[in-house]
């Protein structure tokens, strides 16, 4: 649920968003050159910028690299558990369709080329899939960091034509010791919260 976006599906300019996204992804070098290579590297790739509007690398690393990679791995394991052959292909197709739909919505009100989808689709989403293909990486995030998908349960309101309660969120929890019930806690997605959590004996 994003405050800066309408939750009415009819307010999304789907054709314009897809057209802009197709132009951007079809001409990645031209898109980056229009923004400037230096600006692209410092805002999208490397953690050099600190301004809120310039630190696009933060959601790139957290949502696309780690979150997207974990979502791919979960999807792959879901397809495998349900007896699908070629579970990697199914998972990749599903997660790619999701990412393209998300980028289309983000580009629906834009008129110029934007380098953010280039970094998302061609760098961080791909790197996330490759990273979580590793069983060792997946075990680290799943067992050591106890990473979970804490996304909302979306619903469609046909009377108002709105998509309610949507949002993709993730959580990691790092245990502070084998004998302590306390863990460092970080939750991110629609917003970010850092703190501590306590394991209760009854679950």
Describe the role of every protein-language-model region:
Residues 1-203:
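Hydrophobic alpha-helical membrane segments
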């Amino acid at each position: 649920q994003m405050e800066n976006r309408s939750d009415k599906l009819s307010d999304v300019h789907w054709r314009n968003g897809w057209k802009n996204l197709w132009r951007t992804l079809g001409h990645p070098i031209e898109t980056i050159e229009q923004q400037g290579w230096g600006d692209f590297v410092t805002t999208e790739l490397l953690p050099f910028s600190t301004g809120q509007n310039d630190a696009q690398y933060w959601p790139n690393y957290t949502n696309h690299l780690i979150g997207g990679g974990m979502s791919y791995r979960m999807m792959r394991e879901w397809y495998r558990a349900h007896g699908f052959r070629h579970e990697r292909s199914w998972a990749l197709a599903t997660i790619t369709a999701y990412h393209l739909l998300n980028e289309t919505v983000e580009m629906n009100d834009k008129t110029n080329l934007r380098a953010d989808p280039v970094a998302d689709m061609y760098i961080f989403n791909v790197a996330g899939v490759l990273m979580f293909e590793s069983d060792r990486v997946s075990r680290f995030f799943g067992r050591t960091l106890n990473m979970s998908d804490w996304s909302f349960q979306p619903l469609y309101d046909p009377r108002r034509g709105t998509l309610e309660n949507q949002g993709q969120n993730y959580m990691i929890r790092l245990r502070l010791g084998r004998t302590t019930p306390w863990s460092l806690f970080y939750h991110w997605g629609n917003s970010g919260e850092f703190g501590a959590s306590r394991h209760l004996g009854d679950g």
